[in-house]
Amino acid sequence: MVQRNAPKKAVHFGAGNIGRGFVACFLHNSGYEVIFAEVNDTTVQKLNSQKSYKVIEVGADGTSESTITNYRAINSRLNEAELVQEIATADLVTCSVGPHILKFLAPVIAKGIDARSTDLTPVAVIACENAIGATDTLAEFIKAPENTNPDRLADYDKRARFANSAIDRIVPAQDPDAGLDVRLEKFYEWVVERTPFADHEPPAVEGIHWVDNLQPFIERKLYTVNTGHATAAYHGYIRRKSTVYDALQDREIQEEVKKALANTASLITQKHGIPQDEQQAYVDKIVRRISNPHLEDAVERVGRAPLRKLSRKERFIGPAAELAEHGKDCGALLDAAEMAFRFQNVEGDDESFKLAEIMEQNGPEDVVKQVCGLEPKEKLFPAVVDVVKRVQADTQSD
């Protein structure tokens, strides 16, 4: 196993705001050439014609800028062969495309790994998504028989290692005239599991915090940051607030957020042994972050994709189901889920229209099974059925 005798190279799928502003920024600062794999040809052309862009970090103490260079872009839809060769010789493959897109990345990544020499250090594959076990999910797609010959799996760890991660950074909607520049908050957290690299050094990336057990970090993040952010957005949308900041100036909404995070805190502290005062300090910090007036974010943008956010392993149903099984309070999470069920027919969000269709065409029990992935035997099931009944009754009376 040898290192490539070449500058460090990373392939990143997804040249959106998180890809350019968060992941690529750290890769650039760590000395990697970044190859963006992107399906939007306009974005590909912009990246290839513009040799730098700015990342603007916004905080209570003002703003700071950094310039990102040393990157290229490949249209992954049109130039697969070129992308396969880049993956075959990359040190690192990352992505920020949304959990539902991972299956579409798998074929080309599988081809790149298959073409990789076992003389090289295995390529590190890290999915940077708001989902528990996203890299495991991607790995399953990559190793599936339709993408990888099963005979090649025997020595697969000589070609690739897969590490789950938890990412945390608020990237609001951008100015339409910003071009490639990205504006985001100064705070960040990028935690990656170390165990897949037990027999050699993990990739050197500035900003990554390597841990042996990722689950406490990713659940704390998903069930605090994402739960809090979405709770504010959905309650804010129903109360006709324009931004998350506006929503959190409303005392009632602020209380709803705090109650939801008290629900999740009780799960996190018990399940992962995190001291209550430490978790409360984390909650307080998160509420301050999502209340940042410099990161104006429309409630419609933060609330988009309600079907995903109401799913079984996501920010509301995931923690609520665990709490219910232990007989613990999850009332505020159910209240937030109710607001998410009311997020229907929102312009620009396909899932909100699909949600309205599901709610109209199905009985409450079937809605809960289909949308939330809950089964009747689970203790949370009847409570969510009641939520759906309430929303359906109100919708029919409108």
Curated annotation (Swiss-Prot):
It catalyses: D-mannitol 1-phosphate + NAD(+) = beta-D-fructose 6-phosphate + NADH + H(+). Coiled coil: none annotated. GO terms for molecular function: mannitol-1-phosphate 5-dehydrogenase activity. Gene3D superfamilies: N-(1-d-carboxylethyl)-l-norvaline Dehydrogenase, domain 2, NAD(P)-binding Rossmann-like Domain. Keywords: NAD, Oxidoreductase. Its EC number is 1.1.1.17. One of its GO terms (cellular component) is cytosol. GO terms for biological process: mannitol catabolic process. InterPro entries: 6-PGluconate_DH-like_C_sf, 6PGD_dom2, Mannitol_1_phos_5_DH, Mannitol_DH, Mannitol_DH_C, Mannitol_DH_N, NAD(P)-bd_dom_sf. Pfam families: Mannitol_dh, Mannitol_dh_C. The active site is at residue 221. It comes from the Eukaryota. Belongs to the mannitol dehydrogenase family. Monomer. PANTHER family: ALTRONATE OXIDOREDUCTASE-RELATED, MANNITOL-1-PHOSPHATE 5-DEHYDROGENASE. This is Mannitol-1-phosphate 5-dehydrogenase. It comes from Chaetomium globosum (strain ATCC 6205 / CBS 148.51 / DSM 1962 / NBRC 6347 / NRRL 1970) (Soil fungus).
